[in-house]
Amino acid sequence: SKHAITWLKSIEELPEIPIFAIGNEFLDALPVRQFKRTNGVWKERCVSLDSNFNLFYCYVPSSFHTELQFLHGSVPDNEVIEVCDKAKGFISKFSNKILKNSGCALFIDYAHFGQLGDTFQAVRNHSFVDPLKNLGESDLTCHVDFKTITDAAQFNGLRASKILTQRDFLLNLGIEKRVNYLVRNLNEKEK
């Protein structure tokens, strides 16, 4: 490309111009904290080392319980809640930039809309693997909670559009017509 890439360290460094942003698998790269309530007590899921220096999951008491109850109402015992404060903070700052300069954003990610549960996973060579093994060799991720993202955007004054699956999004853009056009114009070798 004849256009140089400019790397920014923060949202505040964005120029004061209208924003058109596409975030593809951006939000799922942000850190997520997991919590579980057992017998009415909230605990945070952490990682620790055993005496042989093997990683394992453990649960430690959490003082975050008041916010968890507010965010998720009455949560059944032993259900996992995932909280991504960095995503909410990012959306808040990003919303302010859009409100000030106008613009829009499209975020594409593996996601859900407000469901509870453990979505933490590791992928290596297109296969799911143990997140605590082969450190640094796997893609670690959690599914994005788009309810939290849209709530944060709306709280900060933006309008959030309907959440769509990738399939429906592409169909709405006319992918079927495009595929049919391309197929009609294939030569014999390409078919």
Task: Give names to the regions the model predicted.
Residues 1-6:
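Conserved nucleotide-cofactor-binding alpha/beta core module
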Residues 20-72, 118-131:
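A mobile, often basic/glycine-rich helix-loop segment
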Residues 67-191:
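Long, Lys/Arg- and hydrophobic-enriched amphipathic alpha-helices
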